[in-house]
């Protein structure tokens, strides 16, 4: 397919916050074979360039002065079977939840806890998306990339080479702007290995009358939980969890626990402790807070929402207010999850 470039494009349909900003130039990448032509195009070469997936982890505060490329690569295929394991490849532009549901329908298990996470397959390793005790790295085999500095030549990164961390990967650091994710390969399983340890999941399964859950039951429970807590971006603009759960030294967590005995906490790597950002924000009295059309969601304090006409700058100002308030009360720094431009 020939690439089509458009000028002065409204980006509201392409970002889940619904920010009314415009791109100087825009094109959609439907076929990886078009990458060399895209990389050679004057609009790409003069830059800047923003690669866009689902636009669900992005806060746009101003018009974008360069080229926005919407990655719409599609396709899901079973590469091979390895005993009970199924090696499955999904193209970067596939909707994440759609892919999870397709996998479940085929009897390929392991991603059910990650149901209904917004965004695309291509963004999943960048952010190392996670929920309810599972991260994408747990099932990811390798990532297929295009090398942007080598005319789009393909490269494959192993799980280890992706250097996954909490909501982090090599794609946010050395590989940023150099590697474009074009497909992700997963090691899924015919055997169910359910992760139902989170209280919310147990309660939802109980409410659903499920005693012996299947992976599909777990997926349905996760979907029900997320729908009950998180606003639909089609109705109320948002980017899901706006802040990462902070990870602090054990001594700091212990000191906080003395002052706040109800403090939710979870073990993290290197003896550190992960805190619940939503709880910290809630304890500051900010759940449901609103400044104009920029607000903190009234059911999940971790989510910032656009009530209609908030600008990106207003959303950023609200985020800073939340960060400052939490820092003053708890001495804890909150780090935003979305890319802010």
Swiss-Prot record:
Domain of life: Bacteria
InterPro entries referenced in this protein's UniProt entry, alphabetically: FAD-bd_PCMH, FAD-bd_PCMH-like_sf, FAD-bd_PCMH_sub1, FAD-bd_PCMH_sub2, MurB, MurB_C, MurB_C_sf, Oxid_FAD_bind_N
EC assignment: 1.3.1.98
UniProt-listed Gene3D superfamilies: 3.30.465.10, UDP-N-acetylenolpyruvoylglucosamine reductase, C-terminal domain, Uridine Diphospho-n-acetylenolpyruvylglucosamine Reductase, domain 2
Chief place of localization: cytoplasm
GO molecular function, one term: UDP-N-acetylmuramate dehydrogenase activity
Residues covered by the FAD-binding PCMH-type domain: 19-191
Gene Ontology BP, a term: cell wall organization
The protein's required cofactors: FAD
Pathway: Cell wall biogenesis; peptidoglycan biosynthesis
Residues at the active site: 167, 241, 337
Record localization: Cytoplasm
Keywords: Cell cycle, Cell division, Cell shape, Cell wall biogenesis/degradation, Cytoplasm, FAD, Flavoprotein, NADP, Oxidoreductase, Peptidoglycan synthesis
Enzyme class at the top of the EC tree: oxidoreductase
Pfam families associated with the record: FAD_binding_4 (PF01565), MurB_C (PF02873)
Reactions accelerated catalytically: UDP-N-acetyl-alpha-D-muramate + NADP(+) = UDP-N-acetyl-3-O-(1-carboxyvinyl)-alpha-D-glucosamine + NADPH + H(+)
UniProt GO cellular component terms: cytosol
Similarity comment text for this entry: Belongs to the MurB family.
HAMAP family tied to this protein: MurB
Classification via NCBIfam families: murB, PRK00046.1, PRK13903.1
Biological function: Cell wall formation.
Entries under PANTHER family matching the protein: UDP-N-ACETYLENOLPYRUVOYLGLUCOSAMINE REDUCTASE
Name of the protein described by the UniProt record: UDP-N-acetylenolpyruvoylglucosamine reductase
The species this protein was found in: Chromobacterium violaceum (strain ATCC 12472 / DSM 30191 / JCM 1249 / CCUG 213 / NBRC 12614 / NCIMB 9131 / NCTC 9757 / MK)
